[in-house]
């Protein structure tokens, strides 16, 4: 409600087709990360998370240790790019800070709660998306989360795109 009531302000740039295309691709990646984060995620508040953290890295966790939060961060960035006005920046900036700051805070909290299990998980995953691949810690083929997750991510992305007002 507060966002809708805030004075909009002028657009700082006109989002052209290139921005919309890049934004759509990033929204799709964010959707895939979000969907994948719901499967075998030791960061979720669940009993036995330490057992999950000891399992082999799988799916989107090869891309980042915090796929849900990076999905939210990508969504925030895209919304700022396609709606570049002050009220939008306040809203999406808050979402971005919450997503990335929350991820960093979650690393500290899980390290305290899970000890060696989280330390091991953190050593086998990377905070930054594609950080393991870019640093040479993991081969690029591990960045493919699997056909099922990609297809479900596409369905989620299409569904949200269909119902989302522009």
Feature-to-residue mapping (PLM):
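Membrane-anchoring alpha-helices and their flanking helix-loop junctions
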Residues: 1-65, 70-166
